[in-house]
Amino acid sequence: MLRTAYVNGRYVPGHLAMIHIEDRGYQFSDGVYEVCEVRDGCIIDERRHMARLARSLDELRIARPMPANSLSVVMHECLRRNRVRDGIVYLQITRGVALRDHAFPPTDTRPSVVVTARSMNFAENERIAAEGIAVITLPDNRWERVDIKSVSLLPNVLAKQAAREQGAREAWFVDREGYVTEGSSTNAWIVSREGRVITRRAERGILRGITREVLVGVLAAEGLELEERSFTAEEAYGAREAFVTSASQLVLPVVRIDDRPVGNGAPGSIATALRAKFHEHAERS
């Protein structure tokens, strides 16, 4: 239950948290966001998330509403007020409130800031990881700037719903050349028959996931070979392992793709080991 939200300079009860009807995030999806994992009251990889947030704001030419250290204070205060020890903190910044017009509003328009925090049942995540998840593949019909963490997520919503309706937990987008880009809310990985870990290069075809970034370091530390390249759905069908990564779910083994078993149909040893090692390499604040 959301006890308290931060909305434009004020901490307000969750049931009273409101935004203006002409907020550009509400009318145009003109905004960006970040979601950070929280463990033992600490924000995981806050520095990396704030760096990505700054990049997203700059790419959309949205003014920074406050310094990063002030945002950090707000996020930690939301954790305290909502009594969150293990969960997530959500931060959203939009271009602000202005008379509806597709073009940018006047330069003195103040960005809107919303921060919320909620607890999560990480024991349930562990159960899901132990069983592995199913994914489906769908044509990638998103805009090209998915490297920006925009609040405009309708294709992702439709993809996630399609997955749920087919008994899967995630959907992988596939581009026009037949290559997997990423999941609706995750980065996509496979492990080749030879044991090489493969994921698409972090370019404009995918979001540069923070968990993905940390995992690259984990792979190096563990002496595992990484190939940053595109792979097809067909290659994924024949992989030894597959998995997805995200801030709220860490590493989740994939055991079925399009109703075909991956490897022996059980969570792979590499994905399982990477999940266990993740927090040894992540930053806490």
Q: Model-predicted segments: where are they?
A:
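Conserved alpha/beta cores of soluble small-molecule-handling proteins
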Residues: 1-172, 176-179, 203, 207, ...
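Glycine- and Gly-Pro-enriched alpha-helical subdomains that act as flexible
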Residues: 172, 179-202, 208
